[in-house]
Amino acid sequence: MSRIAGTFAELKHNSRKALVTFITAGDPDLAATEALIPLLAESGADIVELGVPFSDPMADGPTIQLSSERALAAGTTLPKILDMVRRVRTRCQVPIVLMGYYNPILIHGLERFAADASAAGVDGVLLVDLPPEEAAEFKACADRHGLDVIFLLTPTSDEGRIRKVARQARGFVYYVSVTGVTGARSGVEASVSSNVAAIREAITVPVVVGFGISTPDQAAQVAASADGVVVGSAIVKLFERFTAAELGREVATFVSALREAIGN
């Protein structure tokens, strides 16, 4: 059983929902990311998504685009991210999912990336621009090295796409609650509950919901119908508002509030 599957099994046994937190690796620098991952886990995150910064983040809104720019300006690269994850693994076992775009992985080499990521302690990979129809080669590499490949479903996904994802899904499925790019929203789409229910009928792995969840109340609302919630832009926004000295405290406070809202 993968670390992600084990986490969801334990959560289900305890009637709890998963809190998945997103930060961009290398923002403001990799030393900060290395310190934040254990802090996120201690504050209540069950899974940590690490954004791999990319120069053309087409699925991301302004907050995460700026975060990627800061990380790239700090010299963040994929090999450096994997080295950082390897160091984190000496003191923290929270599941880590790399989230990003296909191009950096392709440049690194698919087989080499899967081997290097697994050796570093990465548990899963979500590539937002790699649909299941085009993922066979990468998924074969990931499967050989024990990496869960996470796929996206959206409000516009038809039954055919849902079936394709159901056949390939490992770890969990990420349901994008809104059309458009990442970023905080003022409310939760009314269709989330019914759409998630339909997906859960077709898919055996857990379904988590992300994009636009920015407050504890929204997280609680989504958690009522999903297996977990993903909060990203609202956390990354804190990086713009607070100094490096303040950041850890502010992130911990916010994540703890999210955890309390969806149930301890």
Swiss-Prot record:
GO terms for biological process: L-tryptophan biosynthetic process. PROSITE patterns: TRP_SYNTHASE_ALPHA. The active site is at E49 (proton acceptor), D60 (proton acceptor). GO terms for cellular component: cytosol. PANTHER family: TRYPTOPHAN SYNTHASE ALPHA CHAIN, CHLOROPLASTIC (PTHR43406:SF1), TRYPTOPHAN SYNTHASE, ALPHA CHAIN (PTHR43406). Tetramer of two alpha and two beta chains. This is Tryptophan synthase alpha chain. It comes from Geobacter sulfurreducens (strain ATCC 51573 / DSM 12127 / PCA). The gene is trpA.
